[in-house]
Amino acid sequence: SQTDSEVAAWILDLFYSQVKDPKAAIKMLVDRIQGSYGFCILFDDRPGEVYSIRSVSPLVAAYTRSGALIASDLTALIPYTRKYFVVPEGHIVKLTGYKISLYDLEGDKVSPEMMEVNWDMDAAMKHGFPHFMLKEIHEQPEALKNTILPRMTKGLPDFTDDQIPDELFTEFNQVHMVACGTAMHAGMVARAFMEPLLRIPVTVSIASEFRYQEPLIDKKTLVIIISQSGETIDTLAALRLAKSYGSKTLAIVNVKGSTIARESDYVLYTHAGPEIAVASTKAYSVQLAALYLIGCRMALVRGKFNRNQAASFLMELLDAIPAMEAMIEHKDEEKNLVTHLIQQHDTFFIGRGLDYAFSLEGALKLKEISYIHSEAYAAGELKHGTIALITQDVPVIAIATQEHVFSKMISNVKEVKARGAFVILLTKAHAVVDDGLADIHIRIPDLDDRFTVFPIAVILQLIAYYASIGKNLDVDQPRNLAKSVTVE
């Protein structure tokens, strides 16, 4: 066989033929194999029984009026129940009709730890939207409020209810963020504003790289783990590695009771509700909001902000919410501009500083749901090679919201325009730009430079969405991709 799971089934069949006891055979199997897996097992001579076991890969189970259910993702259970339990590693689940039994590997029965999800099936419906992605784009302002407002007391960030003590933010001398994909891009944005604010090293690592390295972290390192599902396998492995070095870990996750949430020293739950579309939108925004809250609290307790400065920072963060709403309301601009985009094979995103961090996520969104080859570059690097790829009508999406490098960005835009690029320029409302510099110019409400990511994110998400629609593709389920990457 060329399939590892098929080999596991053959081994289990061999052991079961010897002992004729499902739990004993499963124990023999897991003693023999290594790696990550989540098995649901049927035995020919035991109709009406399902056995399950997992290692690293997630499994959740529930009792419902429809029967006993088990799945790899909580969303699958929500139409039937809000109460569930996470199958612990090294435990066997037996489902029979309406009954679920949980056993350890010695065969002793144990009681599962029941949990309750704080959203229901209504939150996982389209409600008149043609796609989940568009619905989730529209839900971002409310998701931000749900993440930020409960963590504000007298205008200041407060993690008392999250049981995150201020001591966590004073005992380290560096921050290391670890994540994959969109969550990693949220970390890139956070690094860009945290490092100059805190005046300590802030590093962002791709989890699939971090887990196989010997990272320079120790007991004086705060490792922030970012994952929407809380089950991303590379991120989970990175968390375990960080803990083995003695680092304190703080997880930012959206799913209560997920493996990463349970294994981290501290956890800050985002309150985005279910995100069904594979391409992340509102999860990205609330991860950013959580990171801005953390950065503000860090600055306050480390003496980089006084109370007035921290309160002002949070008010500016809240100002980003109506800015997002304005971009959602005027989404026809993005709908109209993709006509040119979808006729091209390549698209380039450029920016400087925070804008470069934004452009990374914009490029990912476009490629994952429209299948247009798209790359993001720091604008200052164009002349070091990438500008050779700029030819007539090649789309370049230039993000220019950072005041201190605005003139430099405009110079970069002129460079690509001179080589025939089709330029889509994103700036603040007050930006002064020469007529004819851009083929399309989209302005966002004026915000502090640190918070322009929120309306910019909406624009980039809508560009990707309408490009996918324009190419008649499956927006919510793009090819070859899964919502939660739980396998290596």
Regions flagged by a language model, labelled:
Residues 1-126, 130-131, 142-173, 212, ...:
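Conserved short alpha-helical segments that host acidic/polar catalytic motifs at enzyme active sites
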Residues 31, 140-144, 148-176, 266-395, ...:
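Active-site phosphate/pyrophosphate-binding segments
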Residues 44-48, 57-59, 65-68, 74-76, ...:
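Short, glycine-/Ser/Thr-/acidic-enriched flexible segments
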Residues 107, 422, 435-437, 447-488:
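Generic C-terminus detector
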Residues 170-319, 399-445, 463, 471:
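Glycine-rich phosphate-binding loops that contact phosphosugars or nucleotide phosphates
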Residues 186-187, 203-204, 233-236, 336-337, ...:
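Extended hydrophobic-aromatic, low-complexity segments
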